[in-house]
C-alpha cells in the first residue's frame, strides 16, 4: 500500500532533527500517562459535555393551558376555520392580511384578496408575523429597574412627572418612535404637541433611505411599465412594497404574451431577488454606480469598463424607446445626487404620473430638531429629563459611533415600551409590554396610501 503526500508540522520534523522526537514525547508527559483513551471514547465524553452544556442553557417555561372558549358560541362548528381581515406592520406601513382562525386562535396569515393594491399578495414577513404572537419570550408584565411591577405602580410614578410637564409645557420630555403611518397615532402626536408645546417627538428609522422621513415618496407602478432600469433597487426584495411589486411583476410575466412582458435591466452591487429575474444583469461596485447613471442620462464623459458601457447604452436605448412607459429606479441607500438624477430622467421621459408617482410622505414627519441625532445632542447637553421609547431598540440599532446605552444613562426617567425585554429595556427605568398587532385595534396606511383598519383576532395573550 502506497501512501499519499506526507505532511510535516514544523521545520524540525521535515529535517528529521534528533531532538524533535524527544520533544514530542516529553512535551505533555503527564497528560499522555493519565489520559489513555481512544478516539471513540474521546468523542463520547465530548458529546456528553456538549449535551450538559446545552441543558444548562435551558430554562423552564410557564405551563399554560390554551383554552379555545370559555363560553362556546352557539354557531360554532368544531373544526371550522374562520377568516378575519386585518393587517400587520412592516416599516410602519400596513400589510393587509386575511387571518385564518381555528377555535378562536389565529394559525395562519395570507394576503387579503380584497385589498385593491395587494390583491392577495403575500410575503414571508407577512406570514411570519404570527410567530411574534406566540413567542414565549414576549414581555408579560411591567418592569421597574428590571423587577416585576404593576401598572398601578407605573401610574403613580407618572403622576409625579405629569404635574411637572403640565407646568413647564413638556420641557425636557422626549418621545422616540419608529416609522408609523397610523392616522390615529399621528393625530395623538398632534394633540400631544398642542398640549405640551415644549415636548419633542423624535423619529428613529435606521433603515431610512435618501431624504429619510422628509423626502417626497417615490412610488413605482410596475404594472404600467414596459421597460424598467434598476440601479441597485431590489424591487422584488424585502420592503413594504414587496407584495405589490411582486403581484405586478407576476401579471406582466405570467400568461402575458412575450411582446407585452416587462423588460428589466438591473445593475446591482450585491445579488438580489430582482437581479435574478432581470433580462440583463450587471454586477458593479457601489463606487461606480453614479458614473453608470450619468452614462444612462448622457451627462458628460465618464470612464466605464466595456461591460458597463455596453449595459449603459442598452439601458439608455430601452428607456428612450419606451417614453411614458419606462421607469428608472434607484436603491433607497443611494446618495441624494443619484436619486435626483433618476427623477430627472423619469421627468424627461414623461414617466412621472404614468409608471411612477411623487407624493407627500404618508408617515410621521418630524419637525426641526426632532431627528435621532438631535435627540442624542440634547441628551448630552442635559436638556432631556424624561425619554419614552415606543417600540424601537436604539441601543442595539443605533449607528456604531453612537453609544446610546451610555448616552441615555444621563436621562433621569427612561421608559421603554415594546414586545420584548431587549437591550433598550435593559437600560431603562421602566419597561412596559405592548400588544402585538393581531391583538389590538389600530390603523395604518398601506404603501399605496389607502387607510387600513387593524382589528384584533384574539385577546391579548
Residue ranges and their predicted role:
Residues 192-193, 197-198, 204-461:
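Non-catalytic alpha/beta scaffold blocks inside enzyme catalytic domains
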Residues 1-302, 307, 313:
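N-terminal export/assembly segments and adjacent metallocofactor-ligating motifs
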Amino acid at each position: 500500500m502506497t501512501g499519499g503526500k506526507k505532511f510535516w508540522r514544523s521545520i524540525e520534523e521535515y529535517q528529521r532533527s534528533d531532538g524533535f522526537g524527544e520533544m514530542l514525547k516529553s512535551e505533555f508527559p503527564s497528560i499522555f500517562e493519565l489520559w489513555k483513551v481512544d478516539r471513540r471514547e474521546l468523542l463520547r465524553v465530548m458529546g456528553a459535555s456538549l449535551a450538559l452544556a446545552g441543558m444548562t442553557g435551558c430554562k423552564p417555561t410557564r405551563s399554560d393551558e390554551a383554552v379555545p372558549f370559555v363560553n362556546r358560541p352557539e354557531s360554532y362548528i368544531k373544526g371550522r376555520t374562520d377568516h378575519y381581515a386585518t393587517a400587520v406592520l412592516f416599516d410602519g406601513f400596513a400589510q393587509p392580511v386575511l387571518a385564518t382562525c381555528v377555535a378562536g386562535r389565529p394559525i395562519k396569515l395570507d394576503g387579503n384578496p380584497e385589498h385593491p393594491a395587494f390583491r392577495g399578495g403575500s410575503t414571508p414577513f407577512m406570514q411570519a408575523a404570527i410567530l411574534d404572537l406566540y413567542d414565549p419570550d414576549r414581555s408579560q408584565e411591567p418592569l421597574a429597574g428590571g423587577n416585576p411591577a404593576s401598572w398601578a405602580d407605573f401610574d403613580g410614578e407618572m403622576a409625579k412627572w405629569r404635574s411637572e410637564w403640565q407646568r413647564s409645557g413638556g420641557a425636557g420630555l422626549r418621545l422616540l418612535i419608529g416609522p408609523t403611518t397610523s392616522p390615529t397615532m399621528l393625530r395623538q402626536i398632534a394633540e400631544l404637541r398642542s398640549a405640551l408645546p415644549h415636548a419633542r417627538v423624535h423619529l428613529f428609522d435606521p433603515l431610512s433611505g435618501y431624504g429619510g422621513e422628509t423626502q417626497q415618496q417615490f412610488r413605482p407602478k410596475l404594472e404600467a411599465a414596459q421597460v424598467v432600469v434598476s440601479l441597485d433597487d431590489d424591487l422584488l426584495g424585502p420592503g413594504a412594497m414587496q407584495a405589490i411589486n411582486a403581484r405586478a411583476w407576476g401579471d406582466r410575466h405570467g400568461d402575458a404574451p412575450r411582446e407585452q412582458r416587462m423588460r428589466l435591466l438591473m445593475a446591482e452591487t450585491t445579488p438580489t431577488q430582482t437581479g435574478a429575474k432581470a433580462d440583463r444583469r450587471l454586477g458593479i461596485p457601489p463606487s461606480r454606480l453614479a458614473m453608470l447613471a450619468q452614462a444612462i442620462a448622457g451627462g458628460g464623459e465618464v470612464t466605464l469598463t466595456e461591460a458597463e458601457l455596453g449595459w449603459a447604452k442598452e439601458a439608455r436605448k430601452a428607456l428612450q424607446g419606451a417614453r411614458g412607459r419606462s421607469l428608472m429606479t434607484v436603491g433607497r441607500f443611494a446618495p441624494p445626487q443619484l436619486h435626483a438624477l433618476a427623477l430627472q430622467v423619469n421627468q424627461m421621459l414623461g414617466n412621472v404620473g404614468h409608471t411612477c408617482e411623487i407624493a407627500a410622505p404618508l408617515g410621521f414627519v418630524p419637525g426641526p430638531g426632532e431627528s435621532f441625532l438631535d435627540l442624542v445632542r440634547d441628551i448630552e447637553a442635559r436638556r432631556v429629563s424624561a425619554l419614552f421609547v415606543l417600540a424601537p431598540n436604539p441601543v442595539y440599532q443605533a449607528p456604531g459611533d453612537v453609544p446610546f446605552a451610555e448616552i441615555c444613562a444621563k436621562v433621569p426617567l427612561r421608559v421603554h415600551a415594546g414586545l420584548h425585554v431587549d437591550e433598550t429595556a435593559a437600560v431603562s427605568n421602566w419597561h412596559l409590554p405592548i400588544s402585538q398587532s393581531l391583538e389590538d385595534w389600530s390603523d395604518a396606511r398601506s404603501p399605496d396610501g389607502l387607510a387600513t383598519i387593524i382589528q384584533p383576532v384574539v385577546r391579548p395573550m
